[in-house]
Amino acid sequence: MNKNTWIVGFTLFAMFFGAGNLIFPPNLGQDSGHFFWPAVIAFCLTGIGLPLLGVIVGALDKQGYVGSLNKISPKFSVIFLIIIYLTIGPLFAIPRTASTSFEMTVTPIAHTNSNLVLFIFTLIYFLVVLYLCINPGKIVDRIGSLLTPLLLITILAMIIKGFVDYSGNAPSHGNQVDYNSAIGSFSKGFTEGYLTMDAIAAIAFSMIVVNAIKATGVKHANQIFKQTVMSGLIAAIALVFIYVSLGFIGNHMNVDNATLKNLTAKYQNVGAYLLTTMAANSFGVFGKYLLGIIVALACLTTACGLIVSVSQYFNRIFPKVSYKAYTIFFTLISFILANLGLNAVISMSVPVLSVIYPIAITVVLLILLARFIPTKPIAQQIPIAVISIVSILSVISTNGWVKMSFIEALPLKQYSLEWFPIAVVATIIGYVVAKFVNQDHIVYQKE
């Protein structure tokens, strides 16, 4: 394993590790009580395992997901990837990284959230993002060699001090409704990891990883695939360490029921409260600055990864516009939305993400399956069409736009996994139908 693989791996870790990933584990630790380990193991399986799988699958075809999805349907490939890149990019996730950074750095330190201060902060924030992203060939070095070490050092400082301060405490009482047994805790942790939706980002980030590996001079498909796997494993191991550590500390922080009820009543995030408390108790006045640095770096690296991904994709399908022009355009859109109407954008984006997430996971699993089993396009088209319909109907019903009792009665609906048994059945049907359809088997291009 060479130096470049480590740099790419740590870059991938930093791109995945946004502010939400910082908040989820302590909250899980606090809620899981005496059943922490089943919960955190399950959380890592879906919260890290699915994104890792998504990155690896992106390296199966030399054209990445574009090539793999074109074999399902060229039109589906374009529509699906445009929706993914826009929703996790300038229309949702990127503006949110800026607003989250502002809320957890400037607001608690300067005690202000005025529109003028937000404007100045986001202007500086996106100028830094633009500088880091304008040259895609340098993005891996800039994140992997500079920002990631800073991010890891600050997180490790908080984790080490947190262990010293809290590891001697007994586990929290936890949420005894959702985490009342080892099996119940495992299923809840599994669902919570699934709901991070990082598997969608994996589809976007896989292009950066493959391009970065190619830029080092690696040309052979098998070597690109192996280095992608190794880089993904480096990122996954780092994420597991941090998730488990933050979760363990959150599990041993004693928070009384009155405080938890008060936070819930005010719609305040318990994970954010635990992090703030951990930082303040461990480092005093400096704690809020340390946490601010961690959040800012986590958000910045994620924003950079998303800007580069969306710009590279659009430059690939609409090459008449340069990569730099796309970078400037998407950064500008993100800057505007971070200052104007972000809540409205989020309210529109979340249902869209909820629709495409099951489709994205189904796509990843079908591509992986086709790598080992002879597969015709119809065998992939049928389950994707079925899951697309189920996902749309499920989101419509869940949001109360039109209540559908048959959707609400589906197995695993309470875990937002109602699509999975249907995907399994639809895939079996797809492979059976394929036996009677005259199509060539899918072959992924390696060279």
Curated annotation (Swiss-Prot):
<dbReference type="GO" id="GO:0015820">
    <property type="term" value="P:L-leucine transport"/>
</dbReference>
<feature type="transmembrane region" description="Helical">
    <location>
        <begin position="229"/>
        <end position="249"/>
    </location>
</feature>
<dbReference type="GO" id="GO:0015818">
    <property type="term" value="P:isoleucine transport"/>
</dbReference>
<feature type="transmembrane region" description="Helical">
    <location>
        <begin position="116"/>
        <end position="136"/>
    </location>
</feature>
<feature type="transmembrane region" description="Helical">
    <location>
        <begin position="328"/>
        <end position="348"/>
    </location>
</feature>
<dbReference type="GO" id="GO:0015190">
    <property type="term" value="F:L-leucine transmembrane transporter activity"/>
</dbReference>
<keyword id="KW-0813">Transport</keyword>
<keyword id="KW-0812">Transmembrane</keyword>
<keyword id="KW-0472">Membrane</keyword>
<dbReference type="GO" id="GO:0005304">
    <property type="term" value="F:L-valine transmembrane transporter activity"/>
</dbReference>
<feature type="transmembrane region" description="Helical">
    <location>
        <begin position="193"/>
        <end position="213"/>
    </location>
</feature>
<keyword id="KW-0029">Amino-acid transport</keyword>
<dbReference type="GO" id="GO:0005886">
    <property type="term" value="C:plasma membrane"/>
</dbReference>
<feature type="transmembrane region" description="Helical">
    <location>
        <begin position="6"/>
        <end position="26"/>
    </location>
</feature>
<feature type="transmembrane region" description="Helical">
    <location>
        <begin position="417"/>
        <end position="437"/>
    </location>
</feature>
<keyword id="KW-1133">Transmembrane helix</keyword>
<protein>
    <recommendedName>
        <fullName>Putative branched-chain amino acid carrier protein SH1502</fullName>
    </recommendedName>
</protein>
<comment type="function">
    <text>Component of the transport system for branched-chain amino acids (leucine, isoleucine and valine), which is coupled to a proton motive force.</text>
</comment>
<dbReference type="Pfam" id="PF05525">
    <property type="entry name" value="Branch_AA_trans"/>
</dbReference>
<feature type="transmembrane region" description="Helical">
    <location>
        <begin position="143"/>
        <end position="163"/>
    </location>
</feature>
<feature type="transmembrane region" description="Helical">
    <location>
        <begin position="290"/>
        <end position="310"/>
    </location>
</feature>
<feature type="transmembrane region" description="Helical">
    <location>
        <begin position="270"/>
        <end position="287"/>
    </location>
</feature>
<feature type="transmembrane region" description="Helical">
    <location>
        <begin position="350"/>
        <end position="370"/>
    </location>
</feature>
<keyword id="KW-1003">Cell membrane</keyword>
<feature type="transmembrane region" description="Helical">
    <location>
        <begin position="382"/>
        <end position="402"/>
    </location>
</feature>
<feature type="transmembrane region" description="Helical">
    <location>
        <begin position="40"/>
        <end position="60"/>
    </location>
</feature>
<dbReference type="InterPro" id="IPR004685">
    <property type="entry name" value="Brnchd-chn_aa_trnsp_Livcs"/>
</dbReference>
<dbReference type="GO" id="GO:0015188">
    <property type="term" value="F:L-isoleucine transmembrane transporter activity"/>
</dbReference>
<comment type="similarity">
    <text>Belongs to the branched chain amino acid transporter family.</text>
</comment>
<feature type="transmembrane region" description="Helical">
    <location>
        <begin position="74"/>
        <end position="94"/>
    </location>
</feature>
